[in-house]
Amino acid sequence: MTQDEMKKAAGWAALEYVEKDSIVGVGTGSTVNHFIDALATMKAEIEGAVSSSEASTQKMKDLGIPVFDLNSVDELSVYVDGADEINAHMDMIKGGGAALTREKIVAAVADKFICIVDNTKQVDVLGEFPLPVEVIPMARSYVARQLVKLGGDPVYREGVITDNGNIILDVYNMKIVNPKELEQQINKIVGVVTNGLFANRGADVLLVGSPDGVKTLK
């Protein structure tokens, strides 16, 4: 089974968590694209979706899935999204696709977070994948200096502007032993919009695509 086939298996497995006549929160990325393909097969049975990125919005519109603005929606039963890394406590690093802020907002609204990954994303300790931090452009140098004080090596992700008009600093060499605390610490830095640690709001269900099929962890 290739990595993409494992992603596809996890994406399609998430369909069973989608309730009829509901509005579904949809994340961003290669694994989520498989979920969107799956969601399109039951678009007549759901009201529609709320998207965490312009890319996912476009894909859903192309497939005929109605997309709602989050401000017009009071509740979401589920949010389905991938992760760049996830540990045994369901803490994640996300934001490789630079959509972390909108992902975190939609996840906060949803009753249940369903994380879909292939088995290469499971780790014991978070931090080998660089931690993305979304930053107001004028604060880039200041935020970078503060991140160095926290033990990281921030690198400006050149050529990338987020859907919110901001920039990304990728923080390398962080051994993240207390994700909840670090998430809060970084978010307190003036100029930070948010960071890619999803620990204070982690996943509720993890669907892992593997050579042996999809494993469910709760």
UniProtKB/Swiss-Prot annotation:
Pfam families from the UniProt entry: Rib_5-P_isom_A
This enzyme's EC code(s): 5.3.1.6
Active-site residues, Swiss-Prot/TrEMBL: 103
Gene3D superfamilies referenced in this protein's UniProt entry, alphabetically: 3.30.70.260, 3.40.50.1360
Recorded catalytic activity of this chain's protein: aldehydo-D-ribose 5-phosphate = D-ribulose 5-phosphate
Any one GO CC term of the record: cytosol
Gene Ontology MF terms: ribose-5-phosphate isomerase activity
Pathway noted in the entry: Carbohydrate degradation; pentose phosphate pathway; D-ribose 5-phosphate from D-ribulose 5-phosphate (non-oxidative stage): step 1/1
Swiss-Prot/TrEMBL GO biological process terms: D-ribose metabolic process; pentose-phosphate shunt, non-oxidative branch
Principal EC category: isomerase
Binding site for substrate: 28-31, 81-84, 94-97, 121
Keywords: Isomerase
Assembly, per entry: Homodimer.
Function: Catalyzes the reversible conversion of ribose-5-phosphate to ribulose 5-phosphate.
Family: Belongs to the ribose 5-phosphate isomerase family.
Protein name: Ribose-5-phosphate isomerase A
Species: Shewanella woodyi (strain ATCC 51908 / MS32)
